[in-house]
């Protein structure tokens, strides 16, 4: 958002005069804006409230917002509060592209084909967002994966300056005594994480 060259390149590719020069809201700012009534509607996709920095405030925000759309695979705290729940395909059921924080692109194809499924495959997140945009008379111009990938290819890889790689000092690891062990896990994936549903 702060690099004029990047904004100019994307604006030219998209055929618009200019792009905003300010940053958009981060998750905490979105939650706060919804909780205080500054945002009238939210589209929430695949978010587990317990994984957010302030789950209590997130619950307040979802209850306060005027209209809530949820894109989800399974019931959640978000779907319980949503005005509309739209099912979306799981990663294994769709093709797509991941772009990591460094801007590296990784395309993937569907692991499961429609003829391998016992139910009708739900639409992709991108297709659902396109349908919502169409209903709001907003032209995204990304009706399918092929068009979206062509758009990413047209933009090309960023060759300008990048943020410095973060440097963190590793914390000292606990040393177990004889006969002891240290169990370490990632809070977002274990404990009460959604990946444990049904287990």
What are these regions (language model features)?
Residues 1:
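A short, flexible N-terminal coil/short beta segment enriched in small residues
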Residues 4-119, 128-137, 143, 147-199:
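A cross-kingdom feature strongest in bacterial/archaeal respiratory oxidoreductases
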Residues 123:
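ATP-hydrolysis module of ASCE/P-loop NTPase motor domains
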């Amino acid at each position: 958002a702060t690099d004029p060259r990047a904004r100019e390149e994307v604006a030219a590719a998209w055929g618009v005069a200019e792009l905003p020069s300010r940053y958009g809201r981060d998750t905490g700012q979105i939650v706060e804006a919804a909780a205080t009534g500054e945002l009238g509607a939210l589209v929430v996709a695949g978010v587990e409230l317990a994984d957010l920095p302030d789950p209590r405030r997130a619950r307040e925000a979802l209850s306060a917002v005027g209209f809530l759309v949820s894109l989800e695979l399974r019931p959640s705290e978000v779907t319980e509060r949503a005005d509309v729940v739209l099912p979306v395909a799981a990663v294994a059921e769709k093709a797509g592209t991941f772009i990591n924080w460094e801007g590296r692109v990784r395309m993937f194809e569907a692991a499961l084909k429609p003829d391998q499924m016992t139910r009708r495959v739900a639409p992709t997140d991108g297709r659902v967002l396109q349908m919502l945009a169409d209903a709001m008379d907003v032209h995204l111009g990304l009706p399918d994966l092929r068009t979206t990938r062509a758009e990413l290819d047209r933009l090309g890889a960023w060759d300008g300056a990048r943020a410095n790689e973060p440097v963190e000092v590793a914390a000292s690891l606990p040393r177990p005594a004889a006969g002891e062990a240290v169990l370490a896990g990632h809070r977002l994936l274990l404990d009460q994480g959604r990946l444990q549903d049904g287990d």
